[in-house]
Amino acid sequence: MSNLPQTQAHHLQPHPQHPQHLLHHHQQQQQQQQQQQQQQHGHHNHSDFPLPDGWDIAKDFDGKTYYIDHINKKTTWLDPRDRYTKPQSFEDCVGDELPVGWEEAYEPNIGRYYINHIAQSTQLEDPRQEWKSVQEQMLSDYLSAAQDQLENKREMYDVKQQRLLLAQEEYNHLNKLAASRSSLCSSSSSMSRHDPELLRADLMLARERVRQLKQELNHITNDISHTERGMNTLYSVGEKINARENGCYDIAEVQAIREEMLKVHKSLVSGEKVREELMRSLVQIKNELSRQQMNEENADLLNAASPFDRVCVASQTDLCGAGESLNGGARFAEMAKTKLQYAEWRKHIKKLQQQLADHVERIEPGQLESDKDRILLIQEKEKLLNDLNSISLKSRSLEETQVIQQTRQKLEDDLKEAYEANNTCIANRLRFHEEKQHLLDKLQEALKSTKLLEERLKSFSSESTFSISSGSSLGSLSTASSKSALSFTDIYVDHFAVDSPIDVVDLQRRSQRFFQQQQQQQQHRLPPVHGHPVLQQQQSSEVSLSPRSSLSMETPPASPMKYNAGADQPQLPPAAASLAPPKEEPTYANALPAPPAYTAPPPAPIAAVRAPHAYDLDSTVLDCMILEAKLKKLNLNSPLNLAAPLSPISEKPSLLDLPQEMLSRSSSTSNTRSVSAAVSNESVAGDSGVFEASRAHLPRRELAQVQIGLKYLKQEGVLVVSLERANNLLALWTASSDNSQVYLRAALLPNSLTSIRTKALGDFQKPVFNDTFAVPISLDKLLTKSLQVTVVSMTGQKEEIIGTVQISMAEFNPDDSTLKWYNVLSSKFMPSFESLDIPSTSAAAAAAAVAANNTNAMNSNSNNNREESSDESTITSSQTSTLTRNQAPPLELQAQIAEELPEHVRLNEQECSDDDDDDDDDDDEEEEDEQQLIGTEELTNSSGMLDTYLKIMKQQYADKETNTECAFPPEKSRAQSQLLDDRPVKRSQTFTPSAAVSKSRYNCRLNRSDSDSAMHFGVTPHTFHRGAAERRSLRFHTKAPKTATKLHHTHIPRTSLDLELDLQAQHSKLFFLNDQIAKLQNLKDVLQKGCESKDPLIAAWAIENEEFQRLVARADPAKCPEERQLQKLLMKTAKEIHKLRKTKVPKGCPDLVSFKEKITFFTRKGLSVPELPSEFILADGDAIEEEEEEDDNAAETAIAINTALVASSNRNKNLSEHHHRAACNSGAVPKRSATPTPITAATTADASASSAPATAAVAPTTAATVSDDKPDQQRFDYVVDRNYGVEV
């Protein structure tokens, strides 16, 4: 859009001419107004000034306005009135103004860009901001710091090379001793001097040490090469941007770079698939090599207890998930409790993400890598000093002795200076890093617990309507400053390439401990111990700093828990012990499968167990904590583990679960799911030998159980309920006197008019009732009922419900009779169970009939006045909610109380049902309910008791969601009548609660949630969103004004430097990906040949090499699915944390942290693929290279490195000069075109050209033919060079 539309104006009508004196006077007046505007910072519109004489307005084909100068016969995009209404320069701009000649435009794929009509150019950067200069300064500062880091790496290389020379000298000396069988001049101990076995062992150790040091030296060399390559790339990026005019790309070049990035991204995606396939092949080859290593006589043992072929017996007894082992009421209560826990964990995850986003700014990107190199350099010097101290000076000459002593003194001085510098410089940074790791460990544990809760919720029922939002509520993860398809995390976050970092805090503590030991030796003036390195290592402390135990660059060191905690500074607890998940409430069954990786977490401290107090707890979580307190009163101090084993055999899983450590089995380590002991004595699996009988004798409190028999007689249409016996009812209630008795009461809910009860017995331990009842009911109605059996204690005239059992008849098989033991849920764990004084239940049927008749009469009047009401929907949703249905015993209590009310007690439907609601409707609906109340007479003492009880019940309901998974129609007070409801169904016909329910009598009006069948009856003020994360917030949602929802682009836009860094980052990733694929392919071929030939050396290397084991562990299919899903969640959470951190950047301010992460990406070390050694073991007679040869190799390496640096610098300068000359010679600016400029891919470009000195740059070519006849239509095409972006 930088070109000016050239049109002939002879056919256009000129604008009417003004008189000359009027025009002159008008111009003077406008100049005065302009001066006043600059002084007062006023603003004027174009409508305040007319067009000058001879100007006209027209529109282009795309609607863009341009202006015609009839006098000069030219066209321009600039409004001639801008010189009166806009500032003349950037210094005169106020706020977000642009001076005259500048225009802000927008392109969908690129975003905002700016047009300079005067210079006829476009640029990506905002000319009003100085962000580009800040970026250039940050890049220069980082290159200086990276140069220091590179010097540390080179010094580490020199130190390790000296250690390698000493190890080679020791190996050659031992090899000569073994060959000559003479020990007269041996410098080893007296024991090894006369023992050939010890001498042979020392030789093996020395050979292994040489091999390990060579491997470490190779790692350092690769690390140096990687850092140099990254620095060369950053230097080339800076030089290229500086070579541009104003250091900016125009829009055509930006578009070309964007297209090139998308092409590279496609190549990366396809390359990652190839890498994953190679990784899976390596896992298979490694497993095959491991099998070959086993002896043939142990083949049977391998098949029986192989780590690759796991045998799990859990599937023999696994029923259809956790929810199937619970009946209706217990399952609903467990689901509601699990939902609360899930919601709290989600809040905790959001809080941890926010803390991590705040913590990122405290740690300088790339600083941790520099600190790690500095500490590793200190450790290398410590090890070299230890090697020098182990050298015996008896056989050395005087000159050699002086050189060794001088080297020792120099190393001691360097170490002392380094210790002081580290204590003052990196102490705070390491503390911040340790806090960050602590938060990351907490986040990992929280994600793990959340994933387990999701699995539990999904396994409760196949009819469950619970939806788990796996997506983030943070919106799009792409950076707001970029309109490209690739986000910041897509380019600069590669979770596969990042290797497991070395614990820098551990390295620092080890260095400090070594320094303290050195100081203690100096204070006590202890002479250094000289002798054999093996014996010296045995005499040293646990911190092995001898030459036998060199620290690998790629292998993380030992855990700090191995060292004496008293000698260290106070440290944070481990991640798994520092975070205890929010303690689980008393459960009916911890029916959650436990993955092997999470079955044995470290014990959590008491302070961490109470961690939920630190969070923002709501009333629902407070109720859960109250339940925990009640459980503790029963002397059950052991926590209920979140990952308790699954017990699918139990008809009613245990409430008082055993601790996890008591349920663990040593023989079930290879199983994917643990199985607990059978609860019922009649359980088939309990006698089949699947469970261990010893678990029944563990110290625990016995469960209260009831044996119930069920049989349905189809011909008579009668359900036979047999209440046989009970067991250990003292676990529910302790008798207060000797005359206490207990009986069972049963009812079919809902709409139960009468209840059946057994005789009262005084035996609470093993009462035998043997009562059988026949309940006439049709089969269709039976399938919609739920049998509720309550355990009632009676002391004199006082009765108290102490437990309940609820059995869903939808799961009952009418063709078979059952006799099962059911666990009794104690009333102590139900918030609504209170002791009530009930006179008697003898007149239950008569009182219920009177109450039903009164209610039906009122219902008929109410139905005539209003067909639908929000109260009905409130009643329905509350009575079908999970907590309400879970609290079925209180509903039975209400029915019993209503049966005892006098005849003058007349309560309408709305009053009773509104009191039973969870008090979730708005004030308008409550006022409407109060208007429909019918006047009642004064209540007796029993009615007052009912009001008090219902008020207590009103405070207990906390579930605000609507449950539609019931297998029976919702219970209502008016449904106690036997009249059929012939009103039509007012809900969506796609919802069918049960096939046995007749739609002619089913009415369900729901308007309390944002589901497809529960919409508001009026005009909804919000649009419907399926699967909304928080539906209750959308009930009375008001539309936000458009001004509030409009996206404001007040952020810092991308600069040309950002764009070039993104392009080079993509090419660097592609280069290293190709390098990894080549190494993996070579490794696969070698291992495959070794597997076919059964080479023991290759098999030993594949099994023992730690680097190879870490590599294949990433793609091991034997890894449990939960762990793979956890890794995906961690990757997703990293993107969310980045998004959160972006939102914390103030509007209009640059994101310094993100830019620092960009430039540190090029020098960050990724995952290295192990290389097979040329020789797996050294021969005894082979001589190792001497010191002179090593010096020559080091000199050659240094010369090669210097040559590469000089060649790369010269190449960058030459290409920059060539580009500058090409830009000057072109002298033309690409014009705006309706179609994108075609891009010709460079066929000979290679991603490695930026660091390889011999690679020739691809010369820019012009694909389009320039026509001399049509200069106005002249266009330039761009060729993308993989190393230096876009060239004209």
Curated annotation (Swiss-Prot):
Compositional bias ranges of the Basic and acidic residues kind: 1267-1277
InterPro entries with a match to the protein in the record: C2_dom, C2_domain_sf, C2_WWC, WW_dom, WW_dom_sf, WWC/KIBRA_Hippo_Reg
Ranges of compositional bias, category Acidic residues: 911-931
GO (cellular component) term, any one: cell-cell junction
UniProt keyword Repeat present: yes
Subcellular location per the Swiss-Prot or TrEMBL entry: Cytoplasm; Apical cell membrane
Biological process according to GO: border follicle cell migration; negative regulation of glial cell proliferation; negative regulation of organ growth; positive regulation of apoptotic process; positive regulation of hippo signaling; R8 cell development; R8 cell fate specification; regulation of DNA-templated transcription
Keywords: Cell membrane, Coiled coil, Cytoplasm, Membrane, Phosphoprotein, Repeat, Transcription, Transcription regulation
Residue ranges of every copy of the C2 domain listed in the record: 702-822
Residues that span the membrane, as ranges: none
Comp. bias (Low complexity): 1-15, 28-40, 534-552, 565-581, 872-884, 1233-1265
Record-annotated WW domain positions: 49-82, 96-129
Residues in coiled coil: 143-170, 197-232, 333-461
Region (Disordered): 1-55, 515-584, 856-888, 905-942, 964-994, 1213-1277
Chief subcellular location: cytoplasm
Family: Belongs to the WWC family. KIBRA subfamily.
Function: Regulator of the Hippo/SWH (Sav/Wts/Hpo) signaling pathway, a signaling pathway that plays a pivotal role in organ size control and tumor suppression by restricting proliferation and promoting apoptosis. The core of this pathway is composed of a kinase cascade wherein Hippo (Hpo), in complex with its regulatory protein Salvador (Sav), phosphorylates and activates Warts (Wts) in complex with its regulatory protein Mats, which in turn phosphorylates and inactivates the Yorkie (Yki) oncoprotein. Kibra acts synergistically along with Ex and Mer to regulate the Hippo signaling pathway.
Subunit annotation: Forms a complex with Mer and Ex. Interacts (via domain WW 1) with Ex (via RXPPXY motif). Interacts with Mer, Sav, Hpo and Wts.
Listed name of the protein: Protein kibra
Gene name per UniProt: Kibra
